[in-house]
Amino acid sequence: MKKLLTAVATALLIATPSLADPAVKGWKTNDSLGCMMLRECVDETWEISTVADMEDRLRYSNYDTVREETNAIIAELDKMGVKVYLASDKYFPRGHAGVYSTVSNQFFLNDSYADDPIQMLRTLRHEAWHAAQDQWACGNENTQIAIIHNEEEVPQGYVLAAEIAYGNSPVLPWEKEAKWAGGTPNMTLNMLRLINDNNGRPWDVKEPTPMTREWLEMKGCM
């Protein structure tokens, strides 16, 4: 339970440039990703409060099919103190559609993927699930994330998708359920509502996994 999400840790442990003059070593690298996540690079990043904010920035003009769920997820994230940003593709290493930071409680959507409303919503659900995992680790003031579901609950199709994407990476257990959430309408939204409706203590109404329970007890949250 003391492992950080590897993608986040990689981005945050690298040397980052100063606020005054961010000298990014290269775009579409972990260096540029970390600079953005630490908010030392803010050019071409835009805070998103509703779908309308994305429509102002992106070419695709019809987000009607995803508007309701997207707006609801962003509203629940706001209640948790999590900010959502749309950001230029230049910050993201190849294949990164989005990233969540357990340090700043912010996440960033790659504008080159967000231009497709279905892909955008899947990424939003996925990264917002990581925000929920952060809260399950005894509150999002920490830099840890917890597994919410027992691994055997994750449908096999999403297990395989995560294994293809992440291989034998230590983050695989977290990513399996995030993949599941990303592909399942309202799964992330319902979890965020459970968190907010219970004052940030979802474990009071939903039994945690054995390992997460052990962590919560160690931290004095149960």
Predicted regions located by residue number:
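Metalloprotease/metallohydrolase-associated module, dominated by Zn2+-dependent proteases
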Residues: 142-222
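Stable alpha-helical elements in mature extracytoplasmic
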Residues: 69-73, 120, 124, 128, ...
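Short pre-active-site segment immediately N-terminal to the catalytic Zn-binding motif
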Residues: 107-124
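Catalytic Zn2+-binding segment of zinc metalloproteases
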Residues: 128-145
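Sec/Tat signal peptide C-region and signal peptidase I cleavage site
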Residues: 16-20
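Positively charged n-region of N-terminal signal peptides that target proteins for export
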Residues: 1-4
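Bacterial N-terminal signal peptides
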Residues: 7-15
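Auxiliary, metal-adjacent structural segments of Zn-dependent hydrolase domains
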Residues: 21-22, 31, 36-103
